[in-house]
Amino acid sequence: MPPGVDCPMEFWTKEESQSVVVDFLLPTGVYLNFPVSRNANLSTIKQVLWHRAQYEPLFHMLSDPEAYVFTCVNQTAEQQELEDEQRRLCDIQPFLPVLRLVAREGDRVKKLINSQISLLIGKGLHEFDSLRDPEVNDFRTKMRQFCEEAAAHRQQLGWVEWLQYSFPLQLEPSARGWRAGLLRVSNRALLVNVKFEGSEESFTFQVSTKDMPLALMACALRKKATVFRQPLVEQPEEYALQVNGRHEYLYGNYPLCHFQYICSCLHSGLTPHLTMVHSSSILAMRDEQSNPAPQVQKPRAKPPPIPAKKPSSVSLWSLEQPFSIELIEGRKVNADERMKLVVQAGLFHGNEMLCKTVSSSEVNVCSEPVWKQRLEFDISVCDLPRMARLCFALYAVVEKAKKARSTKKKSKKADCPIAWANLMLFDYKDQLKTGERCLYMWPSVPDEKGELLNPAGTVRGNPNTESAAALVIYLPEVAPHPVYFPALEKILELGRHGERGRITEEELQLREILERRGSGELYEHEKDLVWKMRHEVQEHFPEALARLLLVTKWNKHEDVAQMLYLLCSWPELPVLSALELLDFSFPDCYVGSFAIKSLRKLTDDELFQYLLQLVQVLKYESYLDCELTKFLLGRALANRKIGHFLFWHLRSEMHVPSVALRFGLIMEAYCRGSTHHMKVLMKQGEALSKLKALNDFVKVSSQKTTKPQTKEMMHMCMRQETYMEALSHLQSPLDPSTLLEEVCVEQCTFMDSKMKPLWIMYSSEEAGSAGNVGIIFKNGDDLRQDMLTLQMIQLMDVLWKQEGLDLRMTPYGCLPTGDRTGLIEVVLHSDTIANIQLNKSNMAATAAFNKDALLNWLKSKNPGEALDRAIEEFTLSCAGYCVATYVLGIGDRHSDNIMIRESGQLFHIDFGHFLGNFKTKFGINRERVPFILTYDFVHVIQQGKTNNSEKFERFRGYCERAYTILRRHGLLFLHLFALMRAAGLPELSCSKDIQYLKDSLALGKTEEEALKHFRVKFNEALRESWKTKVNWLAHNVSKDNRQ
């Protein structure tokens, strides 16, 4: 490729030639030009360059090769130092095939880590530096120290504690009733295969599923001593059991049947294969994975500064004048010239409007409209709450065309929203902001209520300053000195003077209000009563804190002080109530701190269950440094599994401008506190990058060639060294305990859907058949809704198991990893209902009505006595998914997104529609039934007998019990879905979507009424199942996907 020709990313991913001609610029001014392998790493290229440079002029002026570093211009047109010389040229993908060698400056280790972090989080750390934002700089310094101290503490852990951090236990839910649910396996004998680390010899033992890991290890040590005729000197306490071929360990005082791996083996009839690992090996791993020598740089001791006079400041509460701002002008406004421009401004505390909105005068449309207008709000400066935000909406107005027969003289005007922006009135140090501000605005999107202002939106300006519309405002100086919000001591001092009223009749009214209207809007007189009885709420109804906070007058500083004084002595809340306080409706920082304090009692498993929502709630935070961020980072640095998923939840949204800064800073902090895990994550990132390039290649190739030809070219591409290296020997992003060892190229393929998802298969020699793992890589589909749905199904599974009800669910892994990209776990040994029916039928038109197809397929996969167990698995899982899909309102159910495993477990896939957002055609709802319960399902449940009502009634009982259990936890689902509104999912954007859950769980009814409601839906699903079969017939005929 000649100099001056740009190299788009496609050039580096296409393998037209193994080499590329690169221009090299040496520090001496010498220019060299020669071909190098695109697969070569920078270290190799530097060696070749040095060999050639010795024959060029001025070579004697060059220092040692290690004194120089390559730079290039990257795909975003930025000059980039290539500190990591193990990276390949094809992975770097410079914009031009030009590499410049420059003298290395600064600390190489530090620069290398910074380079790796930048690559990993998808944002250069120099971008954070260039902001010159004091809040960003203070946050980075504080979080770096926080995370590196956590890393230093981790290096001092004993081997068991370090094992708990690196390989957290994977246990089945253990609670009341669940132990009883395990009794049927607890009494069984279990064959376990155990070998010792570094030895090929293995022993098979028969143990009880009630035995602890220590008992199994003691048995193995005795066997080893007997076989090799050695004295028994080693103790089982010095060992842990590793699952072969996985990053998963068994340890601690738990019966074997409580470990997920053992339970999985029991259900599938496989023999567990374990390796005994000595504590010295685990300590060696700890030392190898420790952070490099502490990066916390303690500043040199300096002589104490000369005492300075404390700058004068003014308390906000001493200023009683009305709050006002000056609207100066707009910039880069784009609107129809026939319209008029208006700015609306409002003061908000969460969703609550603190006073009436104010609007500017109308001005003619132009690129830079000028107002120079004072906007005064109906609130005193002293009453501004700490978390008050000033919200702006820029919109155009146009007179609606008057109808011919209209007799109205006054013409109506229509609003056309253009952009919005939000600004916190106080900075992160509690100081009231003053002076001129330029607010870069975000484009407006239609709102269901037609609201112009967006108080829940980000308070960060649009980073696209080159083209974004902007407002210039002036915040006046309200005092001769800086104005600060009062410190907590001053707040409490004022708050303790609040009155306390107590009347017996009012106590009864209070109880009735909190119980009757626990989740609805209160009338004004009810709000007044709840506030008046706030001390009684604290004493007798502490879980109603959210209700009290909502009635607090946040535009009256005396009431705010009394509320916060009460909060200081409020009893710690249960997790459910604390989760509710993280919603945008409760922005106060002291309330947030109290909520996090209540959440600290969460176990790691519970925290992991809610992690997705907690990450989304970060978007509501007004400042970078907040309790929620520190809480998540602290737990992530104490549990690598939590750290893994925290990273990917953040990384998957780095393309969203409104959160890229916050999420990038949190990831940077995490990486500095876990540099070894950073390398693991980088390996995953490299694999995902290769899969995206491979998918792009397949999409283009499939348009030109047949599927077999494209598949063969896909395999050729995968066999290249760079692909094999990137795609092999990594931890699965879907589950870090799963190792993706050797990629099985011949078994890899792509699917026929529009986005051509890749189907990638792996094998592991050490794990045997259990090491066969498949992943699906999707590029072009938004997987966030699938991930949320599967999270809820997994939560349902946990809640059921805690009540002793194991419905054999299959909540397979699903993880978005970037902008419309992500991974899905392959559920092996399974097939779709459509394929089973089509393969058992002669015609696609009759396949949907072949009621024997499913049962015959199960018989072929489960001969003899195994069939009864398979039918039981089908019955349990069918009950679970009937209830789950009904409660979640999952739509678009057809025979291609319902699957069955060979073991009998039924499960659903592809959750593109939920919460009752069903597909329609020609205005007609295509979803005719509450959930899928067809007669061929019933045929399997009844074991192929038409009069086996006992089996069917047992199935109905499973459904009713499962539904009743979910109802008891209804508020948990409501809170979790409410918090997920921050994600911006199209089908979870308004209160109507949440209302669907309230209706499906019948939360406004008694348990007896709710059960009656569910029975009506159950009978309807069974009665109307013929409509489902008609839909399936149409689906099968239109897409005869027989395989």
Curated annotation (Swiss-Prot):
Instruction: Give the phenotype of cells or organisms lacking this gene.
Output: Null mutants are viable and fertile but display defective adaptive and innate immune responses due to signaling defects in multiple cell types including B-, T- and mast and natural killer cells.
Gene3D superfamilies in the cross-refs: 3.10.20.770, C2 domain (2.60.40.150), Phosphatidylinositol 3-/4-kinase, catalytic domain (1.10.1070.11), Phosphatidylinositol 3-kinase Catalytic Subunit, Chain A, domain 4 (3.30.1010.10), Phosphatidylinositol 3-kinase, accessory domain (PIK) (1.25.40.70)
What are the residue boundaries of the PI3K/PI4K catalytic domain, all occurrences included?
Answer: 744-1026
Record keywords, A-Z: Adaptive immunity, ATP-binding, Chemotaxis, Cytoplasm, Differentiation, Immunity, Inflammatory response, Innate immunity, Kinase, Lipid metabolism, Nucleotide-binding, Phosphoprotein, Transferase
The entry's comment on post-translational modification says:
Autophosphorylation on Ser-1038 results in the almost complete inactivation of the lipid kinase activity.
Q: Name one GO biological process term.
A: defense response to fungus
Region entry G-loop, spans: 750-756
| Domain of life according to the entry | Eukaryota
In-chain residues carrying the UniProt-annotated modification Phosphoserine:
1038
C2 PI3K-type domain boundaries: 319-476
Is Cell inner membrane included in the keywords of this UniProt record?
no
Q: What is its main location?
A: cytoplasm
- Hey, what tissues is this thing expressed in? Abundantly expressed in adult mouse spleen as well as in testis. Isoform 1 is expressed in spleen and lung (at protein level). Isoform 1 is expressed predominantly in leukocytes.
Q: Where's it found, cell-wise?
A: Cytoplasm
Where does the record place the PI3K-RBD domain?
187-278
Kinase among keywords: yes
The PI3K-ABD domain covers 16-105
Cite the residue spans of the region called Activation loop. 908-934
- Any one cellular component term from GO for this entry? cytosol
Activity modulation notes: Activated by growth factors and cytokine receptors through a tyrosine-kinase-dependent mechanism. Activated by RAS. IC87114 inhibits lipid kinase activity and is selective in cells at doses up to 5-10 uM. Among other effects, IC87114 reduces allergic responses, prevents the recruitment of antigen-specific T cells into target tissue, and affects natural killer cell chemotaxis.
UniProt region (Catalytic loop), positions on chain: 889-897
UniProt-listed SMART domains = PI3K_C2, PI3K_p85B, PI3K_rbd, PI3Ka, PI3Kc
Region of interest (Disordered), ranges: 287-312
Q: Which family does it belong to?
A: Belongs to the PI3/PI4-kinase family.
Q: What is known about its subunit structure?
A: Heterodimer of a catalytic subunit PIK3CD and a p85 regulatory subunit (PIK3R1, PIK3R2 or PIK3R3). Interacts with ERAS and HRAS.
Q: What is this protein called?
A: Phosphatidylinositol 4,5-bisphosphate 3-kinase catalytic subunit delta isoform
Q: Which organism is it from?
A: Mus musculus (Mouse)
Tell me the organism's taxonomic lineage: Eukaryota, Metazoa, Chordata, Craniata, Vertebrata
